[in-house]
Structure formats: structure tokens, C-alpha cells
Regions:
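N-terminal glycine-rich phosphate-binding loop for ADP-containing cofactors
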Residues: 1-193
Length: 193
């Protein structure tokens, strides 16, 4: 293992160690972020969801799914995660859409405040839920999770930094609302904010 770390360091890579769990650390974050975004399409457009997400990431989930032809990946990984509960079920719309109608990152998009608030809370809810699960179950470390979300997934801040900045009261408001709207997802087993 030490040799692998040395090899990765010499080749300019940053390894993230993950426990033996369904989906690796960053996959759990990205795939559920995208799947939750697809569920949000019941009340917002792909472009509106991407615009709200840009507060936290450099490119919204639908823009990234278009780049990576990612719908089949989300369906596959979330289907695997259903072993942990039905709440991981892939959104049905992912199988019926080839390309999402969305904007380039940074483009102006009007998003009504009610939609913005709903989308923001749900995206943070799924991000925090998966972060809690990764840490509480020892799937990955806090440091790797925070670093990986920024470097590999394009988050402006790691999820633990976001929680710290929002504070425990706001994080728990978001999580309580998320749990009421999307029951079954992991909640924190210890304080993180």
C-alpha cells in the first residue's frame, strides 16, 4: 500500500482510499447528486436546476451528464445502491432522455425564488446525506471526501466546509426537510457542522 501511495505521488495523482462499499466515495456523491437533480425535474427545468447548482459547483449536473453521456451510469450505480434501500432508486426520467436542455455554465437563467430554495435545499440535502454516510460508515475519510469533491467533482467548497460555513442549525434544518421529502437517506450519526 505504501508503494502505491509513493507511485501515485510520483505520477501526480491523489489517491482516495475507500472501504469495500457499493460505489466508491466520490461516485456516491456525484451519482446521487445527479439522481436527485433528476427527481427535482418535477418542479424545475434542467437549466434552472443547473443554475442553482452553480452556487456550489462549476457546472450543473445536467450539463455534466450531457458531457459524459452519464444517464446510463447514474441508472447503473443507483440501481446497485438500491441494495442499501429503495430511496436510491434511479429517477425514471434518466432512461428516457438522451440530452438535457440546459445552458452553458455561467449563462444567465431566471430562477424564481421558490424554485431556487427548493432545489438548493434538496441538492444540499443529498450532498450532506451522502457525506454523513461516507464518514459515519468509514467508507472514506473527511479529508479525502472534502478534497475529492473539490478536485474531482468541481465543487467550489468541500461538503464539510459548506457545513461549517452554514452552521449546525442550518445544516439540520436542511437535513430535517430533506428527510421529510426523501425519507430513508442517511442522517448524521455525529455532529459535523
Amino acid at each position: 500500500l505504501d508503494y502505491l501511495f509513493w507511485f501515485f505521488a510520483k505520477t501526480g495523482k491523489a489517491p482516495i482510499i475507500t472501504d469495500n462499499a457499493i460505489c466508491f466515495v466520490l461516485d456516491r456523491v456525484f451519482d446521487n447528486w445527479c439522481n436527485e437533480s433528476a427527481y427535482l425535474l418535477a418542479g424545475a427545468t434542467a437549466s434552472q436546476i443547473d443554475k442553482v447548482a452553480e452556487e456550489f459547483v462549476f457546472a450543473g449536473p445536467f450539463f455534466v451528464l450531457n458531457l459524459a453521456n452519464g444517464n446510463p451510469i447514474i441508472i447503473e450505480t443507483n440501481s446497485l445502491q438500491m441494495e442499501e434501500g429503495a430511496h436510491y432508486q434511479p429517477a425514471g426520467i434518466l432512461a428516457s432522455v438522451d440530452r438535457w436542455l440546459t445552458h452553458r455554465p455561467g449563462s444567465p437563467v431566471e430562477v424564481p425564488e421558490k424554485i431556487k430554495s427548493t432545489v438548493r435545499d434538496r441538492l444540499l440535502g443529498i450532498l450532506f446525506s451522502q457525506s454523513f454516510d461516507i464518514i459515519d460508515r468509514g467508507i472514506g475519510t473527511k479529508e479525502d471526501l472534502n478534497f475529492g469533491c473539490q478536485v474531482a467533482l468541481g465543487f467550489r467548497q468541500g461538503p464539510l466546509d459548506l457545513m461549517r460555513d452554514l452552521g449546525e442549525t442550518e445544516v439540520m434544518r436542511i437535513m430535517d426537510k430533506f428527510q421529510s421529502e426523501r425519507p430513508g437517506f442517511p442522517m448524521p450519526q455525529q455532529p459535523y457542522a
